[in-house]
Amino acid sequence: MKFHLLLVCVAISLGPIPQSEAGVTEEQMWSAGKLMRDVCLPKYPKVSVEVADNIRNGDIPNSKDTNCYINCILEMMQAIKKGKFQLESTLKQMDIMLPDSYKDEYRKGINLCKDSTVGLKNAPNCDPAHALLSCLKNNIKVFVFP
């Protein structure tokens, strides 16, 4: 139920998107990201706003709490489900949630990282989320994360 409410909030925050332009503005992208962050941060009280800001800036610590916070965001983005990378849904979400200027670079990075979670166990440390985000950070020039 909370996820459906979040999707409605994200859709409202994005506003109408003209059919001729599939992407969103950077402002809309960051607004949607803030909503995700606002849902996931309270679930992981050991992850401070400062740590979340550092993750957004590409400094990705490897600890259970930060990995599970990252997992929460990636699940909301439909990029990971139960520790497994969801290539098709990630590509669909990318087309909806990123400005057009980001898409080619992200499509390449996503395809390079599609196997980064293979063989990793999700419980108890959310390791696949850390592996996926680290791979994306290393393979995408303009890294963005809420």
UniProtKB/Swiss-Prot annotation:
Key words of the record: Disulfide bond, Olfaction, Secreted, Sensory transduction, Signal, Transport
SMART domains from the UniProt entry: PhBP
Single GO MF descriptor: odorant binding
Primary location recorded for the protein, binned into one broad class: secreted
Keyword Disulfide bond part of the UniProt annotation: yes
Annotated disulfide bonds: C40-C72, C68-C126, C113-C135
Recorded GO CC terms: extracellular region
Tree of life domain: Eukaryota
Expressing tissues: Expressed in adult olfactory system. Expressed exclusively in a subset of chemosensory sensilla on the third antennal segment.
Compartment(s) where it occurs, according to its Swiss-Prot or TrEMBL record: Secreted
Gene3D superfamilies: Pheromone/general odorant binding protein domain
GO biological process: olfactory behavior; response to pheromone; sensory perception of chemical stimulus; sensory perception of smell
Signal peptide positions on this chain: 1-22
Signal as UniProt keyword: yes
Record's function text: Present in the aqueous fluid surrounding olfactory sensory dendrites and are thought to aid in the capture and transport of hydrophobic odorants into and through this fluid.
UniProt similarity note: Belongs to the PBP/GOBP family.
Name this protein carries in UniProt: General odorant-binding protein 19a
Biological classification of the source: Eukaryota, Metazoa, Ecdysozoa, Arthropoda, Hexapoda
